From Swiss-Prot:
Protein name: Small ribosomal subunit protein uS13
Biased composition (Basic residues): 105-117
Superkingdom of the source species: Bacteria
Organism: Salinibacter ruber (strain DSM 13855 / M31)
Family according to the record: Belongs to the universal ribosomal protein uS13 family.
Gene3D superfamilies named among the record's database cross-references: 1.10.8.50, 30s ribosomal protein s13, domain 2
GO cellular component, one term: cytosol
Length: 127
């Protein structure tokens, strides 16, 4: 099981799929990496030679921001948005959707568990 950027890449999956276990590497980037390293996309990581593993590891380290470094970069970007007080920063701070989605209904993932608010009683409702 090759270890790349602190992640154990699974042996039993195709190389293209196995690399997606690394944070910041999706399927298109994984196939791009394997193409640069001249490793077959269908070859499983346990079948990679030591030199192929080294080439893949070197390409990821040199050309891409992944794992902890990427997480830090994303957090710093969000922190900057909060500090400058822009609309997106305020939405992050308030824990609401950032990209213009509706919030009257839906947005439960971002807002968290539903907070029940007591409704008006029958006698106090407007007539």
């Amino acid at each position: 099981m090759p270890r790349i950027e602190g992640v154990d890449v699974p042996d039993d999956k195709r190389g293209e799929i196995a690399l997606t276990d690394i944070y910041g590497v999706g399927q298109s980037r994984a196939s791009e990496i394997l193409e640069k390293a001249e490793v077959s996309v269908d070859k499983r990581p346990r079948e990679w030679t030591e030199s192929e593993t080294k080439r893949v590891r070197r390409i990821i380290e040199e050309d891409y921001t992944v794992e902890g470094q990427l997480r830090t970069e994303v957090q710093m970007n969000i922190k900057r948005l909060k500090e400058i007080g822009c609309y997106r920063g305020k939405r992050h701070r308030e824990g609401l959707p950032v990209n213009g989605q509706r919030t009257r209904t839906n947005a439960r993932t971002r807002k968290g568990k539903r907070k029940t608010v007591a409704g008006r009683s029958q006698s106090t409702q407007k007539k």
